[in-house]
C-alpha cells in the first residue's frame, strides 16, 4: 500500500505544470518572438518593449508596413 501512495505522490509532483504561459511574447504583428537570443533560423528585427530581441524567422519577409502596425 505504501508503494502505491509513493507512486501517486511521485506522479503528482512530476506532473505538475507551472501556472502561466511558457510561450515567448509575440512581436512584429504576431509573427516574431521576443527572446534574449535569436535562433540560427531567425534574424533580429528590433527591440521589444522589455529590451529583448524581436526574432523573425528567415522564411518570413519583414515588410516596412508590418513594423508600423505595432509591437
Curated annotation (Swiss-Prot):
InterPro entries, from UniProt?
Answer: Beta_defensin_dom
A Gene Ontology annotation in the biological process aspect, one of them, is: defense response to bacterium
Question: What Pfam families does the database record attribute to this sequence?
Answer: Defensin_beta_2
User: Where does the record place a coiled coil?
Assistant: none
Question: Which cysteines in this chain are paired by disulphide bridges?
Answer: 27-54, 34-48, 38-55
rRNA processing found in the keyword field: no
What UniProt keywords are attached to this protein's entry?
Antibiotic, Antimicrobial, Defensin, Disulfide bond, Secreted, Signal
**Gene Ontology terms, cellular component aspect?**
extracellular region
Q: Which domain of life is it from?
A: Eukaryota
Q: What does this protein do?
A: Has antibacterial activity.
| Protein name as catalogued | Beta-defensin 25
Origin species: Rattus norvegicus (Rat)
Amino acid at each position: 500500500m505504501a508503494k502505491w501512495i509513493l507512486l501517486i505522490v511521485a506522479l503528482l509532483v512530476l506532473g505538475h505544470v507551472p501556472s502561466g504561459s511558457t510561450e515567448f511574447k509575440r512581436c512584429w504583428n504576431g509573427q516574431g518572438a521576443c527572446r534574449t537570443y535569436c535562433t540560427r533560423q531567425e534574424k533580429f528585427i528590433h527591440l521589444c518593449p522589455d529590451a529583448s530581441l524581436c526574432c523573425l524567422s528567415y522564411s518570413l519577409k519583414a515588410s516596412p508596413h508590418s513594423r508600423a502596425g505595432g509591437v
